[in-house]
From Swiss-Prot:
Its EC number is 1.2.1.41. The lineage of its organism: Bacteria, Pseudomonadati, Pseudomonadota, Gammaproteobacteria, Candidatus Pseudothioglobaceae. GO terms for cellular component: cytoplasm. This is Gamma-glutamyl phosphate reductase. PANTHER family: DELTA-1-PYRROLINE-5-CARBOXYLATE SYNTHASE, GLUTAMATE SEMIALDEHYDE DEHYDROGENASE. The gene is proA.
């Protein structure tokens, strides 16, 4: 344990010192680092994909489910998206040093706010090798140093990607310890990292309930997190039929193992006949297992009667729960009870009810006539995301550059003294 603690202490000290140097880093230097990383990944994609295949083979042998394997898998399309995200983040405005709300007060002083970095961010993640790059890019651009701890299932992929990061940071003239990777897979390292409040300013976990529970029980460092992605799509009585079918199908089937996939479909009883038969047929053709309320079960003998547990389950699989409701109020009541406050969407052509839905539904993202799969930092123009927060403090929704900063007050005077 002492050796693990010593390792985390060393990484923490290095990261804290690196964070101090990042405060004065120019936007050009930070952007150059991101562009360098993109180029390194492009040049080394063969070795990255080879490392990823090794991780996939090991994970299949260990019996990882399809959802986790999908998160783990890299291909040329996903690598292209990583590179695209890096370039997009490089092109975003640098939030650090931005001064807002500068106003004269009655005393004659000017008071405003300046945006500053948080300091040192610890990112603990499972199954997603792309997080290695997303997290580094967002932290560097927002002036934060980062300590990465990936899961054992992605150890080869993470190492291949981190090699690209390490070379690129030093080439840009930044402190090499701006981004560090914990090499040991000993789980004690996670516990020590989340307790390292002398060095780490925030922890961002990306993983399952087991990981989040372990972190929450041990952490002395603030956590930016979401527990589940129990997302809902509600088809209103004034929904456009084709929009409803297209949105509901995409929201479930685009990717099953992601937190923005719809897990429960709510349908107004007045549009069941013109929407659900076609939608059910499409789901079944795609291989989606359907579970429904008693009214839904009557529509097809292939639909399994849903249990109380289904409404509060994040499947991360080709499974969907369907419930028929008599009103929007009933739909909102269901969402209030079972939602994880991640993302909800209404399909409706009625302006008043759509506004009511986005006002009354208290999730981190609420949508009108759009698939829940859009709940993503890249799609929101953030250049990517380091995670999605369902908490109400300090940031909510996809966490991009601004979410990795805070504001401090600045006061400008000209010899002012307080009487």
């Amino acid at each position: 344990m002492d050796s693990i603690k010593n390792l985390i202490t060393l990484l923490g000290e290095n990261a804290k010192n690196a964070a101090k140097t990042l405060r004065g880093a120019t936007t050009v230097a930070k952007n150059n680092a991101l562009i360098n990383i993109a180029n390194q990944i492009d040049q080394n994609r063969r070795s990255i994909l080879k490392a990823n295949k090794k991780d996939l083979a090991n994970s299949k042998n260990k019996g990882l489910n399809i959802a986790l394997l999908d998160r783990l898998m890299l291909d040329n399309i996903r690598i292209n998206n990583i590179i695209k995200s890096l370039n997009q983040i490089a092109n975003l405005p640098d939030p650090i040093g931005e001064i807002t709300d500068l106003k004269y007060q009655a005393s004659g002083i000017q008071v405003g706010k300046m945006r500053v970095s948080l300091g040192v961010i610890g990112v603990i993640y499972e199954s997603r090798p792309n997080v290695t790059i997303d997290a580094v890019a967002l932290c560097l651009k927002s002036g934060n140093s980062i300590i990465l701890r990936g899961g054992s299932e992605t150890v080869h992929s993470n190492h291949a990607l981190y090699t690209c990061v390490k070379q690129s940071i030093t080439q840009a003239g930044l402190n090499e310890n701006c981004a560090q990777l914990i090499n040991t897979q000993d789980r004690k390292a996670v516990i020590e990292l989340v307790k390292a409040s002398d060095y780490v300013d925030a922890i961002i976990p990306r993983g399952g309930k087991g990981l989040l529970k372990a972190i929450s029980n041990s952490a002395k460092v603030p956590i930016i997190k979401h527990l589940d992605g129990i997302c809902h799509t509600y088809i209103d009585k004034d929904a456009d039929t084709q929009k409803a079918i297209s949105i509901a199908f995409n929201a479930k089937t685009r990717r099953y193992g992601v937190c923005n996939a719809t897990e429960t479909l709510l349908v107004h009883s007045s549009v069941v006949g013109k929407i659900l038969p076609e939608l059910i047929a499409q789901y079944l053709a795609k291989g989606v297992e359907l579970r429904g309320c008693p009214e839904t079960v009557k529509l097809s003998n292939t639909i399994i009667l849903a249990t109380a547990e289904d409404w509060k389950t994040e499947y991360l699989d080709a499974i969907l729960s369907i419930r028929i409701v008599k009103s929007m109020s009933e739909a909102i009541k269901h969402i209030d009870k079972y939602s994880s406050n991640h993302t909800e969407s209404i399909v409706s052509e009625n302006y008043t009810r759509s506004r009511r839905f986005i006002t009354e539904v208290n999730s981190s993202s609420v949508m009108i006539n759009a698939s829940t799969s859009f709940a993503d930092g890249f799609e929101y123009g953030l250049g990517g995301e380091i995670g999605i927060s369902t908490d109400k403090l300090h940031v909510r929704g996809p966490v991009g550059l601004e979410g990795l900063t805070s504001q401090k007050f600045i006061v400008l005077g000209n010899g002012h003294i307080r009487q």
